[in-house]
Amino acid sequence: VQITLDGMKKTHNEVKHLASGEDVFERVISNIELLNDLAPEINVTIRVNLTLKNKHEYAELYKFCQNRFGERRNIGLTPAFVLDRSISNCDVCIENGILFTHENRSKFILDLAHKGFDSPFIRYPEPFFNECAVRNDMAIAFDPEGYTYKCWEVIGNKEYAIGKLDKDGILANINEKILNRQLYGADTFEDPVCSKCKYLPICNGGCPIQRIQNKFEKAHNDCCTPYKGFTPDFLKIHIARKKALEVAATEKQQ
């Protein structure tokens, strides 16, 4: 289960708020605890939406969750970088310091690692490879109106809807063009540039929905892995951590 936060309490409640004025941040945290109490076997990933304006809150939120959730198992945090996903790739947002670029995203991940914060991005190399839910025929997401999507980042944009639930809860009015485009239209190995790139398959092909926008909607998304251009830095951290684990294991045996 993936649950989203937009920063610490003040920031989150400014982004997501109720007319009643209820503390939405505390409601989310309490619901995570409730879910963990009722079904501790379910893995909960707290996805923290980050821009250049709130990136400094990630470390604080990480420590907050460590203290709040204590010894609870199967609850983890991961940064989710807000990139420009518009077709026009609005330069104003980048110039105003709102959105992450490839370079400052990679540097932020490395900075977290140097400060001792773990993240899925720093676990290099991955023990296995997998693809995004967009290309998984069993994955699906819904909006409040019953429209269905393959990608949770475009929920609410009906141009990407593959169908809609009818009154009986059955998926109907399937848009086969959109469905097939999202399932098969982002094959990395059909991209002449990517298929020759040395970072494939480490990158897993990048974000499929971005690739689809580039291919069919004339967007200019940067789909490359955070490792690109920074592989030596990631490897140094990986090697240092591996050595530290080996030393700790040796000391434990003595």
Name these PLM-found stretches:
Residues 5, 51-54, 200:
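Short beta->alpha junction loops/turns
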Residues 10-137, 141-145, 160-164:
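Radical SAM enzyme [4Fe-4S]-AdoMet core and its adjacent flexible, acidic
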